[in-house]
Amino acid sequence: FRDVKQSDYYYDAVKWALEKGITEGTGAETFSPHASCTRAQTVTFLWRAAGSPEPTGTVNPFSDLSPNAYYYKAVLWAVENGITQGTSADTFSPDATVTRGQTVTFLHRAAGAPSHGGNAAFLDISDNDYYFAAVAWAAQNGITSGTGNGKFAPNAVCTRAQIVTLLYRADN
């Protein structure tokens, strides 16, 4: 991709994600590393990283989830595995952007919500935050080192480069 250089921190992660079939580019020559990820994209990346397992159920719990959508099976799988519950009782909001806090929480749940020891070690993370355990686990396991200056930026939009990097580090 012309927008991914060998010197970019996410170069190996993008290469890995392509080789594993987790994602493709956004065009023939572009990956769009700085583009934001949607809830549908993030859940799909997680599902593909897990080997694209077939969901066991066929009941669609969301009014905004089309059976024809590329992410349909990924969302069903994510709900079945407790990775997400949607944004309300009957909506998934597939096109909503996902934050770094949400993404790490999804990843933590996909990994079976392993326990962590200690704190999240970031100035902008409190033990009262819903994503505290996920961020602490990710930091302690080398999955994230934050965004710099002791911060994680949990409310910042998660980019394509960031999601594939988190997945890559979790897999290695």
Question: Could you describe each region identified by the protein language model?
Answer:
Residues A13-V14, A74:
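Ligand-recognition elements built from short beta-strands and adjacent flexible loops
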Residues T105:
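Alpha-helical segment that forms one wall of the substrate-binding/catalytic cleft
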Residues F1-Y9, E24-K73, E80-G101, R109-A134, ...:
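Feature responds to low-complexity, polar/acidic, surface-exposed segments characteristic
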